[in-house]
């Protein structure tokens, strides 16, 4: 999906840092009216594609430096991306961003950060493709030394959630006003 591509493009070597916000907003929009079961599936596909795109270089390394054949290196890279995508299933557990209050955004952002934390701890501190790592060299640089990458992840996710919620509220208010005027 385009949101997965935007996600990966926000990291080095591309460094289109603003795209992480668009990626998350598009993801939230695509999840908005899904059942929890479908939301978990969609989040899994999103994160699997993010990890496949973001760690595709591992395939080349396994071929060139691990002396593996193409098929085996593709299988190993796919399994790796599959495994590191599993903690993100937690993200599908929220109900709806647009139909809840702004305090609920903190809960949803916390689910994202918990998934990132679990990925980092369960898989030996694997830091690649953590949202906070996409924002070095930005306004968030003052947060890294005191609160760390997970705090940056939280602020980026919360900001994306806030803008998504504000935009959907604005659309619903505009649609309701149009219906009353008709």
Describe the residue ranges of each PLM region:
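Single conserved hydrophobic/aromatic residue that forms the stacking wall/gate
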Residues: 172-182
